[in-house]
């Protein structure tokens, strides 16, 4: 597998793997561009229902942005490429699952927080050394951290540079589930499969509403339109019929 972002799919589930294990899966600018292309493909293909994001190997999810690949000084980061990718990932109209296969460091924490779910191995840990190198993090990333982990845990991670490990990450809400390394793929697949089995109009629509609510920018009119669309959809009729017949529904996204 070549270095960079490797994209694969299995039915309704797609996986993007950060493949730079020799560099702790640190992200180059080209990798961030590649993640945009992945999201372009996922958005264009409605048969893809869930996107899994992970890192290659079994030690590190990602060490964040490769600082050796950063140039241009502070002004060049007014439009922070990592923040732009994370914002888009957060709003992607598909369910996203971060497969946490080890350490999540620096900006990779923000990337993982932009996913809807995080499922990790028991070796999972996060650490953000921003305060140790004099860096002020993006408000959008701090908002995501507060929303997922709560204010106090976010303070510990960003102000004290504490390393939080799997059990604590589960307690504060960062990890939805954690398990042994040998069972990680099965745990991730269970979440991805559950997400993929829901009615597309319902899942994608409610994800959009939840994202807007978390950002404090709900488009109430658009949300009401999505609700009306769901009530009138073939999928809702199919869902009710499936319940009555005691079978699995066959949703078409319409």
Give the location of each predicted region.
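Glycine-rich beta-to-alpha active-site loop
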Residues: 88-137
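Acidic, divalent-metal-coordinating active-site segment for phosphoryl/phosphodiester hydrolysis
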Residues: 162-168
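Hydrophobic, secondary-structure "cap" segments at the distal end of domains
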Residues: 143-152
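Conserved CoA-thioester-binding segment of acyl-CoA-metabolizing enzymes
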Residues: 1-54
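Well-ordered beta-strand positions
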Residues: 111, 117, 156, 160-162, ...
């Amino acid at each position: 597998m070549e270095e960079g972002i490797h994209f694969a799919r299995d039915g309704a589930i797609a996986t993007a793997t950060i493949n730079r294990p020799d560099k702790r899966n640190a992200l180059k600018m080209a990798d961030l561009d590649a993640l945009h292309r992945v999201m372009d493909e996922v958005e264009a293909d409605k048969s893809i229902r869930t996107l899994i994001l992970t890192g290659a190997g079994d030690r590190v999810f990602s060490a964040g942005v490769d600082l050796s690949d950063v140039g241009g000084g502070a002004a060049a980061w007014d439009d922070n490429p990592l923040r732009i990718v994370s914002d888009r990932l957060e709003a992607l109209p598909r369910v996203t699952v971060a497969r946490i296969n080890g350490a999540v460091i620096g900006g990779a924490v923000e990337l993982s927080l932009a996913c809807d779910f995080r499922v990790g191995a028991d070796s999972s840990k996060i650490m953000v050394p921003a305060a140790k190198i004099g860096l002020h993090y993006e408000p959008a990333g701090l908002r995501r951290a507060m929303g997922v982990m709560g204010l106090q845990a976010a303070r510990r991670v960003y102000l004290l540079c504490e390393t939080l490990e799997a059990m604590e990450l589960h307690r504060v809400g960062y990890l939805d589930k954690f398990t042994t390394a040998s069972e990680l793929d099965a745990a991730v697949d269970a979440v991805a499969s559950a997400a993929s089995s829901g009615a597309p109009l319902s899942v994608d629509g409610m994800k959009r509403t939840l994202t807007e609510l978390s950002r404090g920018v709900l488009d109430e009119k658009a949300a009401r339109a999505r609700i009306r669309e769901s009530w009138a959809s073939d999928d809702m009729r199919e869902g009710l019929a499936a319940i009555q017949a005691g079978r699995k529904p066959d949703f078409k996204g319409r």
